[in-house]
UniProtKB/Swiss-Prot annotation:
Lineage: superkingdom: Eukaryota
Binding site for Ca(2+): 159
Transmembrane segments: 17-37
Organism from which the protein derives: Zygosaccharomyces rouxii (strain ATCC 2623 / CBS 732 / NBRC 1130 / NCYC 568 / NRRL Y-229)
Principal localisation: mitochondrion
Protein EC: 3.1.-.-
SUPFAM superfamilies referenced in this protein's UniProt entry, alphabetically: Staphylococcal nuclease (SSF50199)
Annotated GO CC locations: membrane; mitochondrion
Annotated keywords: Calcium, Endonuclease, Hydrolase, Membrane, Metal-binding, Mitochondrion, Nuclease, Transmembrane, Transmembrane helix
Bilayer topology: Single-pass membrane protein
Protein name: Probable endonuclease LCL3
Highest classification ranks of the organism: Eukaryota, Fungi, Dikarya, Ascomycota, Saccharomycotina
InterPro entries cross-referenced by the UniProt entry: SNase_OB-fold_sf, Staphylococal_nuclease_OB-fold
Length: 276
């Protein structure tokens, strides 16, 4: 009996069990935090980085840093927005102010100058001229900022008039559409819903921006203003299930002869591209 007192005392197995539990807890916490980061806080800098499970299901928040055409722009992804520190802990890109603001006095209309003088003297195409002057007079507060880690966005469901490219002339209202989009989006934070990646590796997306009357769909607003047509392709068009709404507002704009529909002879962007 006396010899038993000299034997080493063994610790209960509960210590090893606690170590296992703590290891599982910390491993699970790390994996959960990593999954949360990848799902909600990871920044995407190009369309091909966006995971497939995001398309058609989730919205991404960010800032418009450049508008280069009437139906596309550059988007700086700011995942998590203000809650994730963007704008106060993590810097958002600062854009340089336009000085002076872009207006009809600085940016010429897509209508040739001799045609505009003729129209003003003889009173031809007054409706078209009025719409053109309105859009060309919209102020654009910021300049484009390039060379940033941004996603190139193609606005879904619509086609804006073609600007001058490779020596080809611009379509009427192409400059007006560009200025309206710059006036509406540049320097602002928007939500995008990725729908697809096109042949140019741009993210085709539904885009919404905030106004005093609520959130607006950029594509629908362009159609309502007569600055874009419903996208004509039957195979690659993306409407996020709202094609009927796009068609309705296009017919309404056409009936009111708004923007592009104020022309007597109108060639759609699709027809223009096929012709040239």
């Amino acid at each position: 009996m006396g010899d038993n007192r000299n034997l080493p005392v063994t610790q209960p197995n509960s210590i090893n069990f606690n170590v296992v539990i703590l290891s599982i807890f910390f491993s699970g916490s790390f994996i959960g935090a990593w999954a949360f980061f990848n799902r909600f806080l990871k920044q995407y800098t190009k369309a091909t980085e966006i995971p497939q499970n995001v398309f058609r299901k989730r919205w991404l928040f960010g800032k418009v840093t450049a508008v280069g055409d009437g139906d596309n722009f550059h988007f700086f992804h700011a995942p998590g927005g203000l809650i994730a520190g963007w704008g106060w802990l993590r810097p958002l890109p600062e854009l340089n102010k336009s000085d002076p603001p872009i207006s009809s006095s600085k940016v010429g209309s897509s209508v040739p100058i001799h045609r505009r003088i003729f129209d003003s003297i003889f009173g031809r195409n007054k409706t078209r001229t009025a719409y053109s002057n309105y859009f060309l007079g919209l102020p654009v507060p910021y300049k484009n900022k390039r060379n940033l880690p941004t996603i190139s966005i193609r606005i879904c469901g619509v086609d804006a008039p073609e600007r001058a490219h490779f020596g080809n002339p611009a379509q009427p209202f192409s400059e007006e559409a560009l200025i309206w989009l710059r006036h509406t989006l540049i320097g602002k934070c928007v939500w995008i819903k990725p729908l697809a990646v096109d042949q140019y590796n741009r993210c085709v997306a539904k885009v919404e921006y905030w106004t005093w009357t609520g959130w607006k769909n950029v594509s629908l607003e362009m159609v309502k203003q007569g600055l874009a047509v419903v996208y004509e392709s039957k195979t690659s068009a993306e409407f996020d299930g709202e094609e009927d709404k796009y068609r309705f507002h296009e017919m309404a704009a056409k009936a009111r002869r708004r923007g592009i529909w104020s022309q007597k002879q109108f060639e759609t962007p699709g027809e223009y591209k096929r012709r040239i």
